[in-house]
Curated annotation (Swiss-Prot):
Gene source species: Dictyostelium discoideum (Social amoeba)
SMART domains from the UniProt entry: SET (SM00317)
The protein's name: SET and MYND domain-containing protein DDB_G0273591
GO CC terms, sorted: nucleus
Transmembrane annotation, as ranges: none
SUPFAM superfamilies tied to this protein: HIT/MYND zinc finger-like, SET domain
Amino acid sequence: MFKSFDGLKLSNSELEGRYIIANRDIDIGESILKCKSYFAVTCEDFKKNSCYNCIKLIKSPSPQQVPRCFGCNEVWYCSEKCKQDNQAKHQHYECAFFNNIKSPKLIQNSKLDFDSYSEIRIILGLLSRYYQDKLLNNKFNSSIIINNQQDDEEDFIKDTLDGVLDLVENDINEETNSVAKEYIDNIIEYIINILKLTINNNSNDNNNNNNNNNNNNNNNNNNNNNNNNNNNNNIEELIKLIRPLIQKVRCNQFGIWTKNDKCIGMAVSPSSSYFNHSCIPNCESVRDGSDMTFKSLFPIKKGDQINISYLALDKSTKRRRDYLKFGYYFHCQCPRCNSTDIDPTGKLEDSLDNWISKFYCHQKKCTGLYYSKLKLSLQSLTNIDNHEIQLSCSTCNDQLIVNSNFYLNKPNY
């Protein structure tokens, strides 16, 4: 699965599900994995000034110069090239579904808040691909989806729709999270109405066109009935997918952040989702729009699990666990969160806090981590003079100069 990424091995356990372990010793600053998001959307409050294709801020001086989709009026682009590259996946049912997101028929009775529309768009986008790929048997061209970047295609993992459908999900119900369940129920109802409105309207348009072009009423009626039955069956199959997709996406999505630490988009990348969380991660995701590169923060031994963090790390154990429980529906049992259980004196907790805090970005309000852009081995560190190791923040790209002692005295856990 991981192609040329020879240092990775996919493992599985009943407690942790699927996760990635190091298949060899991994050095500082290694590019562990490169992924192109299978699907990404801009956030609702940034959709007019962020490109829907590359998920980067638009630098155009005026809104009138920003290309957009006039079919749905829900997506904007940084250039005509990005708009053209995106048409292969957007011009079919995704555009039609998006066009009805703000339908007056739906909004007037809606219980949703502003931010809900970002989640609705990512679910509708995935449903549109399933509808086109699985139900209509109109396959996507994967080479088009990755924007025709043939030069670096081999460096990136290719994710698929089947990979999304195979993602692990956490059941969100009255017992696990009653507030989230009610919220999701409202989103599901809204999406169902969009599906029915879109598919039935498109079917009615097609039926009317057929009737106008053919005088055989009996044949037309039979064809119309068959189309209606097929549409109802397709809608029912799509409806069955909505809740599982929401639960999969909520547990596995990645935020796409600007250098100012603003979340402008959300992405789903199945291969990236194999990285489990730890509050003392040994790996960090470096994002470039909807693309991600995972870099090792410090040396990783063969057999160690490779982890990333799902949250800002400069919080107390309680706040971190509460955030993960509410947002990702699990109780964190990482070494840092469990440190007080292992060592009631607090010494282990202090040593782990001190170790990982060295990697926190120094810029105010930035939640990124410092990593080395260059691959460095522990052996080579002894030959590096003071102030020769340059680190970069994964979010804001702030630079930090450290010496070889920065990587020494890593606590055992």
